[in-house]
């Protein structure tokens, strides 16, 4: 159709028939897109005008208007109701029509086409006001501005009309709307007027309330007046009563009433408020009056609005006149042209006008343009007009949730399987046996035992997060797991800080919800330490994340009770919408440990006493508490798409409000919840019926379920309009599965919703255990809404997006709601990937983690054999944070990668030789090759793949061409054949390639430390170093090549590479008569054994023959000229002349000069004459490299990058230094990208992390971010158990009661009780693991008797046989708990270690508790054991264990096979000993004599004296043993029996004449294993044999195996029992009651810990007596590797610290991993203090370890400074830890100044 020659724009007085709410929602949505900037401006201006007008209303009217952020949300309420109905309707109609017009132009991208000569505007009633805005505009931007004034006038007119009209007739009391106008058809205007006049006269109707005609045309008449008067008029007049009439939707008053309004009224409406536009603004387009049918005569805006106001208030509408006016406009145009009507849908009036046009102008072409239909169009991804207009993308998530849901996939498995994670409170939280009272009579006790708990809450990788063990232990576990899940969520998101603009660290913020402080208030408060505040205060939860990752965006910790987690997400979203951050990490945190909170919530009737949250169940009786940690990563959607992220779901809106009107602060309120839903829906412009899934808050309380079911159903599934059957709304409640995570509840709900999107399934609801709660609305099914009672598919409709809502409500009254939709459908770009080789890098912060990461990846590859190697490379390189322990490879396919990974894992050297990258990145030197490496296509793949490299080449090529030289691009991209080329092309292409390569390396993030060029390569090196410009370099190279071609003869001279030194060549040539006179020149000294010589071709050929005759390898160089020889003389003057005008500058990068044999830093060394000399003189590459070494610019770690077509210089560097690290940029006959991949991996492994983002940028849209396994944490358990019952005891204080001292006799009965094991305090049994904590009192009569059966220095000292019996007792108990059907349990007590022996207290009636902790894992068939002293007051464990061991559950058949192979050897030695005794060569000792010798060190009680006779020779002995018949207590294996069969080794060491027993005594620090084939029998007869020998690797230490025999069979063995030689003068110190506590205190302050995990300890003065592990019992505990101390000399305590000889402490020097003692001077003492205070081993304090890596922060620096002063008398400032950032620098300072 031809272009219209005329057009009418029609502004009607009625809304289109479309869903009005939907129209405004869509307007709102489009306004957020920057493609609709003017629409957004118009709506913002209109909203502002309306807010201003509402604010000017009387208070009672203001209160009728709901809050609105945009006028587009006002239609969501019934705006026609109330006194402001007319005003709202008028304003909204104006907004809709103008908004639709503006949006139409922007959507279709139409130029402003309303030409005044071709266009006329027309409309009715309020529509004319909208038309006025267009009439006053000359552009679309004008409409957006002027339109706001039209909105103002419309609103004011409506307010005024309603105000006047209500004075004429009051509204209906029930709110029913009544029409003020009826339309009559079939009667003429005159007939209707006559009937009305008669009615008004007869009824004496006052003038102001009369019924009158407001509009008329040929077929209809509008009758207007007060509703009751209209009704009366129709009843009065039979003609009217029986006419065809209909009420019009005019509900708010009278217009078109000249008898009612005057000019003053019009002035009040139009001019009483300041116009938003100048009143003088000219009228641009004709606007037809609905009264006259002619254009308004007004010339300005002020006049126009007055005329319109006059017409609307006092004028009658004559539609015939309007039609005539439009027909007149049509008539003036081409009668046979085209005419267009532009309107907002069609109406009856418009149909009539169009019919009139068709009748009068039948030949006229007609067109229609609808201004509404565009709003339903899809214009692709939104381009937000502002931050606030953005949708948000959730791109990563991680969790630790109950039931082992330690990652999202495990969480989904739990949901999909419908599992319930309910359990009772684990013993590691608190003891239910003491803290649970269902009757509620015990104060501070919980009335419910139930909860939902995460696995291993204390486990944490402290080293990864640069925290010392001491700091980690004091840090709240939820803070630790916030760090961990934040990292894992970032891993899933592929978030590498700084990779993209949206991930800059200063634009990343953290928001976490937390509502309790259990750890700070309970666990950590048992021993408040340095890290109490940063470890426990809430703000540090997310502050620590910001600090560790160096995020400087906002950091908020939010407490809104149960909704804290989702409120934190909402706050994070608000920060994104406000532009305060570009990426946020948000979540919720809850770890339960404190029974006080259980008691408080129970007493507040929040908690269920019967178990899990029973959401919507009729028996719902409260919620069940739960742990939970969750983190999500959120960005703006456009940023996520730009960053190539995987989008889990999109956030459309999020809001929080408060239930202010609830009946109590903790009671929910349906009205507040509904208001919040509507705010979120309004924010997003979403129809609530389009939401198909709601994740309920759903706590399972009667009040909560009732209120939420009401609010959700009323908003999302109202009775009217009702959902269609295909619009079913599904509901879910995750608390039915995992309980109520309180501060983490909201984030758990969000994670579930995200998984529902990912899995396209709604998991079944398991909360209804009996039947649905009758308080739930009964008609839900009719409304098509309900819980998903089975796993329900939730497919994504084609081309559409699913909407979901997540609720979370706080007990304090807060309501948070988040609205989600599907991620945009992503179509992966599919093109041919030219990269045949891909880099793959994996990293970790520890060797263990790296190995596990590789194993995880291998497993993932096995499960995903179709994985794309390119995607894997992209994910691991560009989308991962990289750490210090690294693996890397370049692979061509998945199979090759798998082979490489397995090979690395299988290699014994892989782990032992693995080293962390250095803290300081190695230096990088670029070596620029000469022209000898030229070939066509030498940069082909790089040129094709990388736009940056290509741009550099093209720019340099353009310079070269402008200098008059040929293009080098064909050489680089390989578009010319490889073959001979001119020197100009050859040399220019090499230099262009090298400059481009150097810049490309910098582009990839490689920082260059120095450059060196070889021959021609020097020009490229100078350009890269900034000595000369790139243009100058190309000019000089090109002109030099031209001069060479012009003045030198090709082929007359040649160059020869000789594998020999310059001196060797000279000697060989001069020494032969045939060659002595031949002239040649040295061109290059490449390496000490690689020299290039040059000369005439004839001379060089003869020399080559002579050298090869002497077996010297020679290679003829393929060059046309002999550079650096006399052949270059003809060009030297001209070259110098050409270079003289060039500006030579000081290098920005040091230049290694082969000419000068030095490093150039200044601007004077390189000049025109330098280039002359460099052309003529030899290239001394060796001298350049050696100069760099002398200057310290390069070292053994330096990386040398060969920048050239082929790695020639790399080979030269290796020839000079065989250990040098060299890599290539390009390599002949190898794909550039394969070469680059290998080189980048090498750089990465060396500690130079490339900018992987740039490497992958060219094809990023083709790659997908893979969901790979998460990081493998190197975890340690940092759990501080709550000891005792003090949360209960404090309740007694108000009664004046005090807690009695710890007494095991008062404790409840225990399931396991023996003479040594007295009370189980904690027990957890799962499928394959079990944990047990037992409490024992060494003052218990049986225990005390066992101690006094082994006396040293008149003290009862615990023998290792005591610990052996405890180990076997606990081991068999736990094993049978897991494997109840087992018949016999065979145990090997192995790796037994001890730090401090236990000495019995002498004070009668005292308590001396100890704690044994055991953890059995069936997967390893082992059980770990740790013994602790405990406080006599509280039962709290000491800071460090005094003994550890491992019980291994083994096959006795294997023992028998082992011992059978050895028995003949043992029996042979026994026979030899007995023969020696018979010969008088060995001592034969009776029982009294043997134990008399033993008494030299230890005095055994009678029951321990089982050896009947002993044959002893030097350090070898055999004993006949008879066990006493009595067990003397309840044991697994009585300690006195164990000692009897094994303490022969102690007699050998302390009774043999081969030992120096006068000056020393010998004690055992332990053994490697202890096994008994069968239980020892009362009265049983055995033989023991042992041979002790000195350990060469450890001075003063002896070891041996004790064999236990019955008859000829070995039935037991103590493997590698060790004895240490100790000066006898220390006997009193270690084994006396008075000194025991003092020695313990001293050793706790100086000795290294047996474990890096230090537990809280009571004050030292209250510690139980214990001494170092210097025991004589045969089965004791060896020192750990870090504590192989030899106490053979008096203490090395500084005199200033010695109080008296009798009180001097023994300082046990720690040893390094090589077994060498750590320096016992100041440095050693300082290291000991540092190890003790941080909880680290001394071995960890290596010289290269940094304080940051060790977790020594500013707070710990202050502590250490104070400890150095107080204990060592050393005054240092805490700032020293900043000035000396590593251990090595610190120790160097101490050695220098202390």
Swiss-Prot record:
Binds 1 phosphopantetheine covalently. Residues 1482-1628 are annotated as: C-terminal hotdog fold. GO terms for molecular function: 3-oxoacyl-[acyl-carrier-protein] synthase activity; fatty acid synthase activity; phosphopantetheine binding. Residues 428-440 have a biased composition (Basic and acidic residues). The keyword Transferase applies. PROSITE patterns: CARRIER, KS3_1, KS3_2, PKS_MFAS_DH. Keywords: Acyltransferase, Multifunctional enzyme, Phosphopantetheine, Phosphoprotein, Transferase. Pathway: Secondary metabolite biosynthesis. Residues 1318-1628 form the PKS/mFAS DH domain. Non-reducing polyketide synthase; part of the gene cluster that mediates the biosynthesis of neosartoricin, a prenylated anthracenone that exhibits T-cell antiproliferative activity, suggestive of a physiological role as an immunosuppressive agent. The non-reducing polyketide synthase nscA probably synthesizes and cyclizes the decaketide backbone. The hydrolase nscB then mediates the product release through hydrolysis followed by spontaneous decarboxylation. The prenyltransferase nscD catalyzes the addition of the dimethylallyl group to the aromatic C5. Multidomain protein; including a starter unit:ACP transacylase (SAT) that selects the starter unit; a ketosynthase (KS) that catalyzes repeated decarboxylative condensation to elongate the polyketide backbone; a malonyl-CoA:ACP transacylase (MAT) that selects and transfers the extender unit malonyl-CoA; a product template (PT) domain that controls the immediate cyclization regioselectivity of the reactive polyketide backbone; and an acyl-carrier protein (ACP) that serves as the tether of the growing and completed polyketide via its phosphopantetheinyl arm. This is Non-reducing polyketide synthase nscA. It comes from Neosartorya fischeri (strain ATCC 1020 / DSM 3700 / CBS 544.65 / FGSC A1164 / JCM 1740 / NRRL 181 / WB 181) (Aspergillus fischerianus). The lineage of its organism: Eukaryota, Fungi, Dikarya, Ascomycota, Pezizomycotina.
């Amino acid at each position: 159709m031809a272009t219209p020659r005329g057009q009418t724009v029609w502004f009607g007085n009625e809304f289109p028939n479309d869903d009005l709410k939907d129209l405004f929602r869509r307007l709102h949505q489009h306004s957020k897109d920057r493609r609709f900037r003017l629409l957004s401006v118009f709506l913002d201006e209109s909203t502002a005008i309306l807010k201003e007008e509402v604010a000017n209303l009387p208070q009672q009217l203001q209160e009728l208007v709901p809050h609105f952020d945009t006028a587009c949300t006002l239609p969501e309420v019934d705006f026609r109701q109330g006194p402001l109905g007319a005003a709202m309707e008028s304003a909204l109609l104006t907004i809709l029509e103008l908004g639709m017009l503006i949006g139409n132009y922007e959507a279709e991208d139409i130029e402003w086409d309303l030409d005044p000569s071709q266009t006329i505007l027309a409309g009715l009633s309020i529509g004319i006001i909208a038309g006025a805005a267009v009439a006053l505009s000359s552009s679309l931007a004008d409409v957006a501005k002027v339109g706001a004034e039209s909105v103002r006038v419309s609103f004011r007119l409506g307010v005024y009309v309603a105000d006047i009209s209500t004075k004429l007739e009051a509204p209906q009391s029930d709110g029913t709307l009544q029409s003020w106008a009826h339309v009559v058809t079939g009667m003429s205007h005159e007939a209707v007027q006559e009937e009305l006049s008669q009615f008004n006269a007869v009824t004496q109707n006052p003038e102001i309330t009369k019924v009158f005609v407001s509009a008329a045309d040929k077929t209809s008449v509008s009758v207007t007046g007060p509703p009751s008067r209209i009704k009366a008029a129709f009843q009065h007049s039979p003609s009217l009563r029986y006419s065809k009439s209909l009420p019009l939707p005019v509900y708010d008053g009278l217009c078109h009433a000249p008898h009612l309004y005057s000019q003053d009224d019009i002035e009040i409406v139009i001019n009483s408020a300041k116009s938003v536009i100048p009143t003088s603004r000219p009228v641009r387009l004709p606007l037809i009056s609905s009264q006259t049918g002619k254009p308004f005569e007004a010339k300005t805006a002020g006049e126009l609005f007055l005329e319109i106001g006059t017409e609307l208030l006092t004028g009658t509408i004559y539609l015939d006149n309007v039609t005539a006016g439009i027909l007149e406009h049509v008539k003036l145009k081409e009668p046979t042209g085209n005419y267009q009507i532009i309107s907002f849908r069609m109406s009856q009036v418009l149909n009539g006008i169009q019919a009139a046009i068709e009748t009068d102008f039948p030949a006229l072409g007609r067109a229609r343009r609808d201004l509404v239909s565009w709003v339903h169009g899809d214009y692709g991804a939104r381009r937000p007009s502002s931050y606030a207009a953005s949708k948000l993308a959730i791109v990563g998530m991680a969790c630790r949730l109950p039931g082992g849901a330690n990652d999202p996939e495990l969480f989904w498995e739990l949901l999909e399987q419908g599992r319930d994670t309910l359990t009772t409170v684990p013993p590691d939280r608190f003891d239910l046996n003491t803290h649970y009272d269902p009757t509620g009579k015990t104060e501070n006790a919980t009335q419910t035992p139930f909860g939902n708990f995460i696995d291993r809450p204390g486990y944490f990788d402290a080293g990864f997060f640069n925290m010392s063990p001491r700091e980690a232990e004091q840090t709240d576990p939820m803070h630790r797991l916030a760090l961990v899940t934040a990292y894992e969520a970032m891993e899933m998101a592929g978030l590498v800080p700084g990779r993209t603009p949206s991930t800059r660290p200063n634009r990343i913020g953290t928001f976490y919800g937390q509502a309790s402080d259990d750890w700070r208030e309970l666990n950590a408060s048992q021993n408040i330490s340095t890290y109490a505040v940063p470890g426990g205060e809430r703000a540090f939860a997310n502050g620590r994340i910001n600090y560790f990752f160096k995020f400087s965006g906002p950091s908020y910790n939010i407490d809104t009770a149960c909704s804290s987690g989702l409120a934190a997400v909402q706050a994070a979203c608000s920060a994104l919408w406000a532009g305060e951050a570009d990426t946020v990490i948000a979540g919720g945190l809850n770890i339960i440990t404190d029974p006080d909170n259980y008691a408080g919530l129970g007493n507040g009737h929040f908690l269920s006493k019967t178990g899990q949250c029973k959401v919507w169940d009729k028996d719902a009786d409260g919620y069940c508490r739960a742990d939970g940690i969750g983190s999500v990563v959120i960005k703006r959607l456009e940023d996520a798409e730009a960053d190539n992220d995987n989008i889990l779901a999109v956030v459309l809106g999020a809001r929080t409000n408060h239930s202010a009107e609830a009946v109590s602060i903790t009671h929910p309120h349906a009205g507040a919840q509904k208001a919040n839903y509507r705010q979120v829906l309004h924010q997003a412009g979403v129809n609530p019926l389009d939401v198909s899934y709601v994740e309920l808050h759903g706590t399972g309380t009667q009040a909560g379920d009732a209120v939420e079911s009401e609010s959700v159903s009323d908003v999302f599934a109202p009775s009217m309009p009702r959902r269609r059957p295909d619009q079913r709304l599904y509901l879910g409640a995750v608390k039915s599965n995992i309980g109520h995570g309180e501060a983490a509840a909201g984030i758990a709900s969000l994670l579930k919703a995200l998984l529902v999107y990912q899995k396209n399934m709604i998991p079944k609801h398991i909360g209804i255990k009996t039947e649905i709660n009758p308080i739930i609305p009964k008609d839900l099914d009719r409304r098509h809404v309900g819980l998903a009672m089975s796993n329900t598919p939730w497919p994504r409709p084609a081309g559409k997006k699913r909407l979901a809502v997540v609720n979370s409500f706080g007990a304090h009254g807060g309501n948070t709601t988040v609205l989600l939709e599907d991620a945009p459908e992503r179509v992966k770009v599919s093109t041919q990937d030219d990269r045949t080789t891909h880099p793959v890098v994996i990293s970790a912060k520890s060797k263990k983690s790296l190995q596990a990461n590789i194993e995880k990846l291998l497993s993932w590859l096995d499960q995903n054999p179709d994985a794309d190697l390119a995607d894997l490379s992209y994910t691991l390189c560009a989308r991962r944070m990289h750490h210090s322990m690294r693996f890397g490879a370049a692979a061509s396919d998945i199979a090759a990668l798998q082979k490489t990974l397995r090979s690395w894992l299988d290699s014994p050297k892989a782990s032992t030789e693995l080293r962390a990258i250095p803290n300081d990145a190695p230096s990088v030197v670029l070596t620029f090759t000469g022209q000898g490496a030229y070939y066509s296509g030498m940069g082909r793949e790089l040129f094709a793949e990388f736009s940056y490299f290509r741009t550099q080449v093209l720019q340099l090529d353009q310079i070269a061409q402008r200098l008059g030289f040929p293009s080098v691009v064909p050489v680089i991209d390989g578009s010319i054949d490889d073959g001979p080329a001119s020197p100009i092309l050859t040399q220019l292409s090499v230099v262009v390639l090298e400059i481009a390569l150097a810049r490309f390396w910098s582009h990839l993030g490689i920082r260059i430390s120095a450059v060196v060029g070889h021959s021609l390569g020097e020009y490229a090196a100078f350009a890269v170093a900034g000595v000369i410009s790139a243009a100058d370099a190309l000019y000089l190279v090109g002109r030099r090549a031209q001069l060479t071609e012009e003045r030198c003869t090709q082929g007359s001279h040649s160059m020869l590479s000789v594998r020999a030194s310059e001196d060797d060549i000279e000697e060989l040539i001069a020494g032969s008569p045939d060659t002595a006179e031949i002239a040649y020149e040295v061109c290059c000294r490449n390496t000490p054994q690689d020299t290039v010589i040059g000369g005439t071709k004839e001379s060089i050929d003869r020399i080559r023959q002579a050298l090869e005759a002497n077996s010297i390898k020679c290679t003829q160089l393929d060059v046309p000229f002999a550079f650096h020889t006399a052949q270059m003389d003809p060009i030297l003057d001209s070259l110098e002349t050409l270079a003289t005008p060039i500006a030579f500058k000081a290098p920005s990068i040091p230049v290694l000069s082969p000419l000068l044999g030095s490093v150039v830093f200044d601007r004077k060394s390189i000049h025109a004459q330098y280039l002359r000399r460099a052309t003529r003189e030899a290239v001394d590459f060796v001298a350049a490299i050696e100069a760099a070494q002398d200057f310290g610019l390069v070292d053994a770690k330096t990386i040398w990058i060969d920048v050239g077509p082929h790695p020639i210089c790399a080979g030269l560097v290796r020839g000079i230094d065989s250990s040098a690290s060299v890599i290539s940029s390009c390599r002949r006959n190898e794909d550039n990208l394969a070469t680059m991949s290998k080189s980048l991996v090498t750089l990465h492994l060396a500690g130079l992390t490339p900018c992987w983002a740039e490497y992958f940028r060219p094809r990023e849209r083709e790659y997908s971010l893979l969901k790979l396994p998460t990081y493998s944490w190197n975890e340690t358990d940092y759990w501080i158990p709550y000891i005792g019952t003090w949360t209960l005891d404090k309740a007694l204080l108000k009664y004046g009661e005090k807690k009695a001292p710890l007494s095991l006799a008062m404790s409840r009965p225990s399931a396991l009780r023996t003479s040594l094991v007295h009370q189980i305090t904690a027990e957890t049994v799962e499928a394959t693991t079990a944990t047990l904590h037992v409490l024992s009192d060494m003052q218990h009569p049986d225990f005390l008797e066992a101690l006094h059966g082994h006396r040293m220095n008149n003290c009862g000292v615990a023998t290792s046989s005591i610990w052996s019996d405890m180990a076997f007792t606990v081991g068999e108990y736990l094993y049978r708990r897991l494997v109840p059907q087992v018949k016999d349990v065979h145990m090997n007590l192995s790796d037994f270690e001890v730090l401090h022996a236990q000495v019995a207290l002498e004070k009668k009636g005292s308590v001396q508790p100890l704690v044994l902790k055991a953890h059995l894992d069936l997967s390893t068939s082992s059980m770990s054991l740790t013994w602790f002293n405990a406080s006599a007051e509280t039962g709290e464990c000491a800071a460090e264990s005094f003994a550890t061991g491992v019980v291994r559950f083994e096959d006795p058949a294997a023992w028998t096979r082992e011992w059978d192979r050895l028995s003949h050897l043992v029996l042979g030695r026994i026979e030899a000993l007995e023969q020696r005794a018979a010969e008088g060569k060995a001592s034969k000792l009776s029982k009294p004599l043997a134990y008399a010798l033993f008494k030299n060190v230890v005095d055994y009680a009678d029951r321990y004296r089982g050896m009947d006779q002993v044959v002893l020779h030097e350090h070898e002995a055999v004993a006949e043993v008879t066990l006493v018949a009595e067990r003397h207590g309840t044991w697994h294996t009585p300690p006195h029996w164990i000692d009897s069969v094994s303490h022969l080794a102690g007699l050998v060491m302390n009774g043999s004449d081969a030992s120096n027993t006068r000056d020393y005594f010998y004690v055992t620090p332990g053994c490697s294993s202890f096994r008994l084939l069968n239980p020892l029998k009362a009265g049983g007869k055995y033989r023991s044999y042992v041979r002790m020998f000195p350990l060469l690797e450890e001075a003063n230490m002896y070891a041996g195996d004790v064999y236990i025999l019955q008859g000829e069979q070995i039935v037991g063995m103590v493997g590698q029992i060790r004895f240490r030689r100790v000066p006898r003068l220390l006997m009193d110190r270690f084994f006396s009651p008075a000194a025991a506590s003092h020695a313990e205190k001293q050793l706790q302050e100086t000795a290294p810990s047996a474990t890096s995990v230090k537990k809280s300890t009571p004050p030292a003065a209250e510690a139980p007596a214990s001494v170092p592990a210097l025991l004589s019992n045969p089965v004791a505990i060896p020192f750990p590797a870090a504590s192989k101390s030899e106490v053979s000399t008096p203490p090395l305590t500084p005199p200033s610290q010695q109080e008296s000889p009798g009180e001097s402490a023994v300082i046990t020097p720690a040893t390094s991993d090589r077994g060498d003692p750590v320096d016992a001077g100041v440095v050693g003492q300082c290291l000991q203090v540092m190890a003790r205070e941080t909880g680290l081993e001394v071995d960890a304090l290596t010289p290269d370890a940094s304080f940051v890596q060790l977790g020594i922060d500013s707070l710990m620096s202050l502590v250490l400074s104070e400890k150095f002063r107080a204990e060592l008398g050393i005054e240092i400032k805490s700032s020293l830890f900043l000035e000396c950032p590593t251990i090595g620098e610190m120790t160097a300072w101490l050695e220098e100044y202390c």
